[in-house]
């Protein structure tokens, strides 16, 4: 394992508008997934299992349930191990984060305080397992200034992602944020190379590019920082399909990764984690997802998922109406999960 000083900044401040009405009162990373864990537990577990600490979660929108979950599951529990997880909020209401890059820029004091070699800037709304140290090794071996974790996605869905154009040695030649006409992979016209929203930066470079971006009024990694970096610095794409995590079962989908930013994707990922041979098995003693309870109730959730023909309009949870576009099992999970952490 490579020995370098790394801190992690987890981006958790977005409003999650595509997941409304679930995110009307809760931050997207705090939404329950399956069996007790929240969406944010996947990135935190990957960083903790990779022995990267400290971790700072940059929150903003509806942060109360996220704060409560991290405090009880990570900071007041043995599940957190030796990993330090801290939630950082905007200092005043007038200083709300204007974008992903602005969120990090407003917290550059964390980098100055720890003086790391590398800064991991990771998204908080994806379901996956990843050994981040393998990406660190790739970054160092390439002499990279910035590395972007990437995964092939179907070309018809690529417009929803930041798309990477790279050459044979993974050097990024162009970065296009949610393009109307995504550039396909050279050897596979049906797929494009998508950013996972996980970045490694040399610390000094990150401070410099964010200060320059702030002077230009640029606030977003995908729209501003990465397109510039791909032209002016050594930027590389780390192929997530080559990341190997111990304990993955033979029936699981290799290099499983899902962006759960829509109701359809969120529901689909939950179903992938259910059943006797799930695509993504939540239990893995060699790479645990912190916050997971024993899989009680898994069969019942799977039964509901399989038997659902349509979307009902009401549920018995607290005798409150359920929005018509939210499946029963999703609404019940949200209601019960939030009650449990209250």
Where does each model-flagged region fall?
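Left-handed beta-helix
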Residues: 1-7, 204, 211-342
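N-terminal glycine-rich phosphate-binding loop and ensuing alpha1 helix
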Residues: 2-75, 83, 92-94, 110, ...
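Well-ordered alpha-helical segments embedded in enzymatic catalytic cores
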Residues: 39-43, 102-106, 225
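Active-site-proximal specificity loops/subdomain of glycosyltransferases
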Residues: 82-104
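Short aromatic/basic micro-patch
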Residues: 97, 129, 200, 220, ...
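Conserved core of the sugar-phosphate nucleotidyltransferase
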Residues: 115, 129-204, 213-215
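Short aromatic/hydrophobic "clamp" motif used to bind/position activated sugar donors
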Residues: 119
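Active-site acidic Asp-centered loop
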Residues: 122-124
């Amino acid at each position: 394992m490579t020995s370098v000083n790394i801190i992690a900044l987890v981006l958790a401040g977005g409003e999650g508008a595509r997941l409304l009405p679930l995110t009307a009162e809760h931050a997207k990373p705090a939404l329950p997934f399956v069996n007790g864990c929240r969406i944010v537990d996947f990135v935190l577990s990957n960083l903790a299992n990779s022995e990267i600490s400290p971790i700072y979660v940059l929150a903003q929108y509806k942060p109360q349930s996220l704060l409560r979950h991290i405090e009880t599951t990570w900071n007041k529990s043995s599940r957190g191990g030796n990993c330090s997880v801290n939630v950082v909020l905007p200092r005043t209401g007038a200083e709300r984060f204007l974008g992903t890059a602005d969120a990090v820029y407003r917290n550059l004091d964390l980098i100055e305080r720890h003086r790391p070699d590398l800064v991991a800037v990771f998204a908080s709304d994806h379901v996956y397992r990843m050994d981040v140290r393998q990406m660190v090794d790739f970054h160092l071996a390439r002499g990279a200034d910035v590395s972007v974790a990437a995964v092939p996605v179907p070309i018809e869905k690529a417009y929803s992602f930041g798309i990477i154009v790279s050459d044979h040695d993974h050097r990024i030649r162009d970065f296009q944020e949610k393009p109307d006409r995504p550039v396909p992979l050279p050897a596979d016209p049906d797929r494009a190379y998508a950013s996972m929203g996980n970045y490694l930066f040399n610390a000094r470079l990150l401070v410099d590019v964010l200060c320059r971006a702030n002077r230009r009024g640029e606030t977003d990694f995908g729209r501003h920082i990465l397109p510039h970096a791909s032209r002016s610095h050594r930027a590389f794409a780390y192929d997530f399909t080559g990341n190997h995590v111990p304990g993955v079962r033979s029936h699981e989908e290799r290099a499983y990764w899902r962006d759960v930013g829509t109701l359809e994707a969120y529901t689909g990922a939950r179903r992938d984690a259910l059943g006797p041979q799930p695509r993504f098995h939540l239990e893995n003693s060699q790479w645990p997802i912190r916050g997971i309870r024993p899989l009680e109730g898994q069969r019942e959730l799977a039964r509901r998922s399989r038997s659902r023909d349509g979307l009902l309009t009401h549920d018995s949870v607290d005798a409150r109406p359920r929005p018509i576009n939210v499946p029963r099992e999703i609404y019940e999970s949200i209601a019960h999960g939030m009650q449990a952490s209250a």
